[in-house]
Amino acid sequence: MGNGVTKLSICFTGGGGERLRPKDISVLLPDPLDEGLGHSFCYVRPDPTLISSSKVHSEEDTTTTTFRTISGASVSANTATPLSTSLYDPYGHIDRAAAFESTTSFSSIPLQPIPKSSGPIVLGSGPIERGFLSGPIERGFMSGPLDRVGLFSGPLDKPNSDHHHQFQRSFSHGLALRVGSRKRSLVRILRRAISKTMSRGQNSIVAPIKSVKDSDNWGIRSEKSRNLHNENLTVNSLNFSSEVSLDDDVSLENQNLQWAQGKAGEDRVHVVVSEEHGWLFVGIYDGFNGPDAPDYLLSHLYPVVHRELKGLLWDDSNVESKSQDLERSNGDESCSNQEKDETCERWWRCEWDRESQDLDRRLKEQISRRSGSDRLTNHSEVLEALSQALRKTEEAYLDTADKMLDENPELALMGSCVLVMLMKGEDIYVMNVGDSRAVLGQKSEPDYWLAKIRQDLERINEETMMNDLEGCEGDQSSLVPNLSAFQLTVDHSTNIEEEVERIRNEHPDDVTAVTNERVKGSLKVTRAFGAGFLKQPKWNNALLEMFQIDYVGKSPYINCLPSLYHHRLGSKDRFLILSSDGLYQYFTNEEAVSEVELFITLQPEGDPAQHLVQELLFRAAKKAGMDFHELLEIPQGERRRYHDDVSIVVISLEGRMWKSCV
């Protein structure tokens, strides 16, 4: 939605054992892949039985996280434009409409179309046409542990002491900061991976930093490091905005967060995995008329949500308990040889048994505290907290924009749709403003009519499907779609008659309140973040006359009141599709669910979100009478006539998304 985008800057600290000096550290990256089209990324939670001593996942028994796998992909259709509030361009030019950044627990790679000369390529286990090279999940399965875009939760290489300032991260082109020998034995690599996971002691958070220094290239800069209980607490930041501030909530810094965020045109995606609280946060912000509103949401909404959920899904006592456990574990790790001998001696004195009993007691207390917290969770209050977080974020945005109205009146035009999903254990909380959607893939009820539909589909597709699936062994009936689509969100657009009636009832004196299926002939959505020119007359009057609307009265034409929904996961729930509205330009809810279901059956090692993006582009090209590559050769901006910016996140809800039909 819209036609603009912003700059991307990367600021974070080193991960070494020493406190960093307050100076910038720049690393030039060699020949990255073209990132202008979009990205595919994934997050696969490690199996706690394989890495049982990992500090990150040691609380698996006391923190329930239902999801197992996250697959995401974004593609841009709009050109790259700078923020209207930027005083200068720190990179000298804006040349990327898409960018991605994350901690090392995420793997990502730019979308790379298959060369024309390669000819038609079909996936090994099914008749699915390919347009892009392998995504990060498929590469991980194909390449094994030597591939840096694999499925490990952290970097394979243990940082060298000479490079302690370099905090290794999952760059989108898949290259490490330090090029080392890749001719290592498998045992050595696994040993390093396990050692790295066991010794990982740094916590990382994503937070916006206000100041940005000049640089001609993509670089790495140290920003801030704190020493907490003899450990470095690393604060990492990715700036899409030049006018943001660092949230100083100490409790947020004490978390162990894995995060990813990216842009595609004017879409923004934010994924935060909180190992500390056992929740997953996903935000998709579909901007329009400029990049400032979605950038502001990307930088500010999650910290406000976190603060509003205090006392509901987390509290200070948990943070304090974690800090004490952290301090205690550090003392254990730094014990001397004499202390180790004393430990062995205590074993013979049966003191070990008493310590084991004490450990069991503490674990039971933690489990009991968690269970009690779950029973006391008021879902209505959680949803209200999400709503309050959005309200406070928009108020802060409009207040800031109001102070800049004389210099940047175009801020009155900029807005964004909002889709937020918060998963805590088996509870899903969804908040949306606009027309982005959350669609749940559920196992259908085995009733007569559904069985009849399956029979019809099986008969219709028999000739076309069976010929293509000769190489796929096993039960062919599993290929027949058997999942239904359940939309958790409510569309706020002029396509919904209730929304149109609401606006007309609020403006009885304005016959042009909804014209040409748009609010005041301007906006398709009926609710949005920002877009002040449709909310207050003063914002409309600040615009150039050619952009002004005929504002009648003082009541707002659109609002930012979200739709809220709570869903308790059950045995029938399989996966959740979160997406901006660009996906549903070519898919219905049912088609999207069926496409993902069929794909993960035929291609268990593939990337479902990337597949949806790919299929969307195939459909857009076919509708326009061109092939896949011809569509992608159209410059961004002009390509917006054929498809919108699209951001998709597919979350597995059954513990393991990938199951083979073989």
From Swiss-Prot:
The modification Phosphoserine is found at residue 153. InterPro entries: PP2C, PPM-type-like_dom_sf, PPM-type_phosphatase-like_dom. The keyword Transmembrane helix does not apply. Its EC number is 3.1.3.16. It catalyses: O-phospho-L-seryl-[protein] + H2O = L-seryl-[protein] + phosphate; O-phospho-L-threonyl-[protein] + H2O = L-threonyl-[protein] + phosphate. Mn(2+) 2 binds at residues 286, 581, 644. Expressed in seedlings, roots, leaves, stems, young inflorescences, flowers and siliques. GO terms for molecular function: metal ion binding; protein serine/threonine phosphatase activity. Disruption phenotype: Plants show abnormal leaves altered in shape and curling. It holds the Pfam family PP2C. Mn(2+) 1 binds at residues 286-287. It is an enzyme of class 3 (hydrolase). GO terms for cellular component: nucleus. Keywords: Developmental protein, Hydrolase, Magnesium, Manganese, Metal-binding, Nucleus, Phosphoprotein, Protein phosphatase. It is found in: Nucleus. Its cofactor is Mg(2+); Mn(2+). Residues 249-653 form the PPM-type phosphatase domain. Involved in leaf development regulation. The conserved PP2C phosphatase domain (250-651) is interrupted by an insertion of approximately 100 amino acids. Belongs to the PP2C family. This is Probable protein phosphatase 2C 4. It comes from Arabidopsis thaliana. The gene is PLL5.
